[in-house]
Design a protein with these regions (language model features):
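Short, hydrophobic/glycine-enriched beta-strand segments
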Residues: 10-17
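Long, internal low-complexity/basic segments
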Residues: 9, 355, 366, 378-422
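Secreted, luminal/periplasmic, and some membrane-associated catalytic domains
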Residues: 7-9, 25-27, 31, 36-55, ...
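Low-complexity, glycine/alanine/valine/leucine- and proline-rich hydrophobic stretches
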Residues: 301-362, 367-370
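Short, solvent-exposed loop/turn segments at secondary-structure junctions
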Residues: 18-21, 47-48, 62-64, 121, ...
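A short aromatic-rich beta-strand->coil structural motif
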Residues: 228, 295, 338-342, 365-369, ...
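Short, solvent-exposed turn/loop segments enriched in Gly/Ser/Thr/Pro and often Arg
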Residues: 40-61, 119, 148, 187, ...
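Active-site His/acidic residue clusters
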Residues: 123-163, 225, 233-237, 241-242
Length: 422
């Protein structure tokens, strides 16, 4: 039977969140999977963090499309901020301004697949896999199992090798088996408090006695895991920066100064790779609620926990405890995920040196299963597929229309005008 032309009918996706590929490679079952299948590492977009990367790997879309940028936000940036609380208070928010897009399970169900999606603890993994793989079916079926694991779990148990053996047996030679990860812990060299540095620059002004921020005289501040906000007059509760010319001047100064001036006091090394203007990263209808600037740290440097909530302390740099790791706010390459898969539609023994976007995982899996997709931020990774399959199943290169419609453009312009940007 020609599986490539008939189509795959069984798929199992083992989603291991928080795991490093290097820890998995030591397992013979993973080595066998890499020899028979394909592997690519997947980089997230700034701003990094578990929630943002969850959305990217499961939807194929950047969360900015539905108004999500970070899990920590200034209260004044929420659609309906609470009254009686300082608008600059940092609050937790895991949802966007709009509903998230359809996720992989929904996309498969819409295409006629039967989907079972479990999110479990590592202790439940083996029992869950046993239950899922004991059931045979004649329908197109995809089973997705997600759990969070770490290096210690791999070292002290045989759960993952056992789970992989069961999965390979269930999908057989004609199905798809994928091992997927959305994020891994990043080692920390130094924690950095950007707000301390902004205070030293005079961008943030503090009261000499209380040391509280004097907002009417503060030009910008850092929050969350990469957000740099201009304290804009007419938009923020106690805005200080006038729109247009003064706004542009403050942005230009921070974009140029932070990467060159903020340096590790011990080595003199730069700690910020780049400061992006929001227009460089985002272009959708929620541009109006994106951070004015986005900070990307160099590998090894992360925002201090205090700075993510607008805290100001004596030390700009703090040393982590031995072996300490973190995820949110790290350089994208340090918290990358990966896709490891084997299927009749995929190549054999292909491990890509170049990383792909984290958003390419969903279109790659869908294309391997011969499921049509639209409105993705990345196409499927062509180098992972067999030439024979690509010949009869070319990859969509128009993953989504990048241009806004006239109606969307008018909506964005109206919002920006209301906020004083134009």
């Amino acid at each position: 039977m020609d599986v490539v032309n008939k189509g795959i009918q069984k798929a199992l996706i083992l989603w291991l969140s928080g795991i490093r590929l290097e820890n998995l490679r030591a397992l013979p079952e993973v080595e066998s999977l890499m020899q028979d299948g394909v592997m690519v590492e997947l980089d997230p977009s700034p701003i990094t963090g578990p929630q943002a990367q969850y959305y990217q790997i499961l939807s194929g879309r950047l969360p900015a499309h539905f108004g999500f940028f970070d899990t920590l936000l200034p209260l004044c940036r929420l659609p309906h901020p609470q009254q009686g609380i300082s608008g600059y208070t940092i609050v937790e928010e895991s949802a966007g301004r709009d509903a998230p897009p359809e996720m992989l399970p929904d996309l498969l169900r819409n295409a006629g697949w039967t989907v079972e999606h479990e999110e479990i603890s590592s202790a439940e993994l083996l029992n869950c896999m046993q239950g899922l793989t004991q059931v045979e079916t004649t329908l197109a079926t995809c089973k997705i199992v997600k759990c969070t694991v770490g290096a210690e779990f791999i070292a002290r148990t045989t759960t993952i090798p056992d789970a992989l053996r069961m999965a390979r047996s269930w999908v057989g030679q004609t199905g798809l088996l994928a091992v997927l990860s959305d994020i891994q812990p990043a080692p920390v060299k130094r924690f950095v408090n950007i707000n301390n540095f902004l205070a030293e620059m005079g961008v943030i002004e503090r009261d000499e006695q209380s040391h509280l921020i004097k907002w009417p005289n503060t030009l910008a501040y850092y929050a969350g895991h990469g957000q740099l906000w201009i304290n804009l007059l007419g938009r923020d509760p106690q805005g200080a920066v006038h729109p247009q010319d003064e706004y542009e001047e403050v942005c230009d100064t921070l974009v140029k100064a932070l990467p060159t001036k903020l340096r590790d006091p011990e080595t003199g090394a730069q700690v910020i790779e780049r400061v992006y203007r929001k227009e460089e990263l985002y272009s959708n209808e929620y541009l109006f609620c994106a951070p004015d600037l986005i900070v990307v740290f160099k590998p090894g440097y992360l925002p201090s926990p205090q700075s993510t909530r607008l805290g100001l302390y004596e030390q700009t740099f703090t040393v982590p405890t031995a072996g300490e790791t973190a995820m949110a706010g790290a350089h994208p390459s340090m918290v990358s995920g990966f896709l490891l898969a084997v299927a009749p539609t995929l190549a054999s023994g292909v491990s890509l040196l170049d990383h792909a976007p984290l958003t390419s995982a969903v279109p790659t899996l869908l294309h391997a299963l011969n499921v049509e997709y639209v409105n993705m931020d990345s196409p499927a990774v062509s180098a992972l597929f067999s030439p024979a399959y690509l010949e009869t199943h070319p990859i969509r290169t128009d993953a989504q229309g990048q241009e806004l419609s006239e109606e969307d453009e008018e909506l964005v312009i109206g919002r920006l005008r209301d906020l004083g940007y134009i």
